[in-house]
């Protein structure tokens, strides 16, 4: 795969309209995310031809350039450096461009509702992506600790060293989840246009304790809010609601606040308003929403058909860049079950891609371009990074993308069926890698080995069905050159 270079980023910047057309540059695990002032200036066809670019996705004013794992952060750093240097400015808009821009605006108006949803959900990438490496690290360490515990502690006479090692490996996950709400509150309020620290403070209201007799946690110093009982329910849903609404309140307060008093009073007024709203409205409503979301997805996950639908449609959400919208559901399931039972179901979608791509490889002749593409993308796909296969192999050919979704649905059906029969499995953390890398992170009510076995079974079924469906039904009239 091509290396991210300064020259490559300068080329990308030129093709999106120059530095003057980039309002914001960020990234997720695999994508460079550019918020453009005028999306009509971006040359999608030319961007896709750049060596190292695996695909381009547009979500309203945000252009997402797929670069692959380990490269998006480097690309974002280089891009921001180029923008700050001011070496590349946006080209002037000529009269010839006006018809193109008008057509683009018409297209945006027609898809206003869809774009608004996409725009909202895409912000979840900004909230949760910086936390994903921590989720993965804590999950892997917890998986290793649980494995050691099963082998050397349960039913054994463990050494002091082994007990200390297990406790040490688990402590990072406990630390992450103890204060995770504060991190999410910070990122959420910042993502929606407010000050991150205000979001963190509002999120801390859900972490503090309100029972003076409690022996655990940090007592807030108050047990009621002006006569109203305080029940810090809602968990991540409540935190997100408080931070998102808090950002809107902060922006509105700032509109009316004199510049000289902005730094001193804007946050004060915002916190006073949002503290009351959080205690009186958001905590009760967030609690009910949290329970409802948990109930819905627990029932979907325990239903083979529901699990198949979720797994089969997940790749479509990846294509539109809105798959981060599932993250709040992950939190709800962690709270309800102690593990994330939705994640292994959705992970089957990537396995279906692997099976479909292997079928295309088998059908294609030697020394063809598609074989070269698959060779470069299949290992990341097996390891859980599916975007190279999606944008480089299956999606451009359409039929294999559909049969890959069928393969994912088959694996999802299997995991849902096992759950329906009484053995739900899930990830031991909120978010983690998919593919074979996720195997040691799997757990269940019957222990980690049962969880790992069910997950591997689902992967094998998705590989097999994705391969068979593509080999027999997904290759006709498809470019295999």
Swiss-Prot record:
Keyword list, A-Z: Cell inner membrane, Cell membrane, Kinase, Membrane, Phosphotransferase system, Sugar transport, Transferase, Transmembrane, Transmembrane helix, Transport
Domain of life the protein comes from: Bacteria
Coiled-coil ranges per UniProt: none
Main location: membrane
Sequence ranges assigned to domain PTS EIIB type-1 in this UniProt record: 1-89
Annotated catalytic residues: 28
Record EC number: 2.7.1.192
Catalytic activity annotation: N-acetyl-beta-D-muramate(out) + N(pros)-phospho-L-histidyl-[protein] = N-acetyl-beta-D-muramate 6-phosphate(in) + L-histidyl-[protein]
Stretch forming the signal peptide: none
UniProt free text on domains: The EIIB domain is phosphorylated by phospho-EIIA on a cysteinyl or histidyl residue, depending on the transported sugar. Then, it transfers the phosphoryl group to the sugar substrate concomitantly with the sugar uptake processed by the EIIC domain.
Stated role: The phosphoenolpyruvate-dependent sugar phosphotransferase system (sugar PTS), a major carbohydrate active transport system, catalyzes the phosphorylation of incoming sugar substrates concomitantly with their translocation across the cell membrane. This system is involved in N-acetylmuramic acid (MurNAc) transport, yielding cytoplasmic MurNAc-6-P. Is also able to take up anhydro-N-acetylmuramic acid (anhMurNAc), but cannot phosphorylate the carbon 6, probably because of the 1,6-anhydro ring.
Annotated protein name in UniProt: PTS system N-acetylmuramic acid-specific EIIBC component
